[in-house]
A protein has these predicted regions:
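Outer-membrane pore/translocation modules
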Residues: 23-35, 148, 152, 157
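Extracytoplasmic loops and strand-loop junctions of Gram-negative outer membrane beta-barrel proteins
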Residues: 25-28, 100-102, 138
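Solvent-exposed loop/turn segments connecting transmembrane beta-strands
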Residues: 30-40, 63-70, 104-111, 140-146
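Bacterial N-terminal signal peptides that target proteins for export
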Residues: 1-7
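Sec/Tat signal peptide C-region and signal peptidase I cleavage site
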Residues: 16-22
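Bacterial N-terminal signal peptides
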Residues: 7-16
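Predominantly the C-terminal beta-signal and adjacent terminal strand-loop region
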Residues: 125-159
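Gram-negative (and chloroplast) outer-membrane scaffold detector with strong preference
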Residues: 45-115, 122-126, 151-159
Length: 159
């Protein structure tokens, strides 16, 4: 009898667990170091109420006249966010790590990097949201610029 109660309690507890969700974002924005350059990319994420995990790929274009390198990043991130949108806004903070490749002319550097930042997902219609994100990347190794700031806007689909 005691085992039956324990199993029933466990089943009730598991049946009330919150649903996992996933989302995808395509974005375009600007990276600011050493000059403003276009950046674009995508994210894929999944999580529970407050904690989420996402993979992000970003590609910043090279600007030879300003000696500004291209930067490609592949980062795994953890997001801490509000469990639901508040007046249509869902703010979040994020931190992550991964690899980068910086190139300028014939020179390149591939190494490890970390990023920290935050943003907001803005409800538009149904599962479609806008996303505004700010990140600071700290690049290890010998990059031309070891700190890069990025701001983007994107279209986010929650599923």
């Amino acid at each position: 009898m005691r085992l039956a109660r324990l199993l029933l309690f466990g089943a009730a507890l598991l049946s009330t667990a919150s649903n996992a969700w996933a989302d995808a974002t395509v974005f375009i924005g600007t990276a600011t170091s050493p000059s403003n350059r276009t950046t674009r990319g995508f994210t894929l994420g999944a999580g529970l109420l407050i904690v989420a995990f996402e993979f992000e790929y970003g590609d910043t274009v090279e600007d030879l006249p300003d000696a500004a390198p291209s930067l490609r990043t592949g980062m795994g991130n953890v997001l801490i966010q509000t469990p639901f949108a508040i007046a249509g806004f869902q703010p979040y903070f994020t931190t992550g790590a991964g690899v980068y490749r910086e190139s300028l002319g014939g020179l390149s550097e591939t190494n490890f990097g970390i990023n920290n930042g935050g943003g907001v997902k803005i409800s538009l219609i149904g599962p479609v949201r806008a996303r505004v994100d700010y990140r600071v990347f700290s690049l290890r190794g010998s990059p031309i610029d070891d700190t890069v700031q990025r701001l983007y806007v994107g279209l986010n689909l929650k599923f």
